[in-house]
């Protein structure tokens, strides 16, 4: 069952308060009660602050028809988090109503550490107390106040898993424990990818698991019908994010020295495409 109060109940005022609890009682499952949602949230003007686990709609897609999103989808239960958001498009001043933006930033914590340990029987790699970060920003070009049926939306969605304790087998039945960063620097490295893993030495990358999607949507709408096409381009790491990676390192002892102005262009794949028509 579920109980709650939506923020829209205070629509029109400067302030708003909402909350929700949604529970399920499964059969033949690992838990007797499943908390689907449990959150409290507040709004001041256009900004919202949400604390807890809440389901969020997908952006730039039809939530009733789409099969999902490649980064911030709905195919898993929500992660407990603190989320600061501008959930609806805000019109940028001095753009004559043509440019709008929205987005969010959030930090949370995964709750499946015990399950990972049980599932792996603590014999293969697993991690406990993993922290979570997500952020997204969207721009819309269009003006509903003038006769222009076209609009264009583009956005960047990113998520990261970081922190916690990683357990790796030694081969003799014992486990090595790596305490990943959980301080302020780790949170900043999740926000702006940087740092390195606790067990990395020579071949260092950024800290945590960094992934995301470029999303875009083109809309045409008049009094008779609406049509739209959208795209979701998944990436993991910086090189995949920009489809380009440096490829001019030396060899031998100069394996990590930049020698030439050479770059590698990755294949354009991992796209999800869709179309929508309303009559």
State where each predicted segment sits:
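Outer-membrane beta-barrel translocator domains and adjoining extracellular loop/strand segments
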Residues: 30-33, 61-68, 113-122, 165-171, ...
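Long, internal scaffold/assembly segments composed of regular secondary structure
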Residues: 152-154, 162-279
């Amino acid at each position: 069952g579920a109980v709650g109060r939506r923020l829209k109940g205070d629509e029109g005022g400067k302030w708003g308060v909402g909350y929700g609890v949604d529970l399920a009682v499964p059969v033949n499952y690992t838990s007797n009660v499943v908390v689907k949602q449990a959150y409290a949230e507040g709004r001041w003007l256009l900004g919202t602050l949400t604390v807890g686990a809440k389901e969020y709609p997908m952006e730039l897609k039809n939530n009733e028809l789409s099969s999902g999103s490649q980064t911030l989808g709905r195919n898993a239960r929500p992660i407990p988090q603190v989320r600061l958001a501008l959930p609806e498009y805000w019109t940028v001043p001095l753009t004559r109503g043509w440019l709008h933006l929205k987005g969010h930033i959030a930090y949370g914590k995964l709750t499946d550490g015990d399950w990972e340990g049980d599932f792996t029987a603590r014999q293969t790699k697993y991690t406990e107390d993993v922290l979570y970060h997500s952020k997204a920003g969207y721009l819309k070009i269009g003006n509903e106040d003038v006769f222009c049926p076209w609009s264009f939306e583009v956005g960047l969605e990113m998520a990261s898993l970081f922190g916690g304790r990683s357990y790796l087998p030694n081969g003799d039945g014992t486990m090595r424990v790596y305490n990943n960063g959980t301080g302020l620097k780790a949170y900043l490295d999740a926000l702006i990818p940087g740092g390195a893993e606790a067990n990395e030495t020579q071949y260092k990358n950024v800290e945590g698991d960094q992934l995301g999607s470029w999303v875009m949507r083109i809309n045409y709408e008049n009094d008779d019908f609406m049509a739209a096409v959208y795209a979701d381009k998944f990436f993991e790491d910086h090189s995949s994010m920009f489809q380009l990676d440096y490829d001019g390192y030396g060899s031998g002892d100069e394996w990590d020295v930049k020698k030439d102005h050479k770059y590698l262009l990755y294949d354009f794949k991992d796209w999800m495409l869709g179309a929508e028509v309303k009559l």
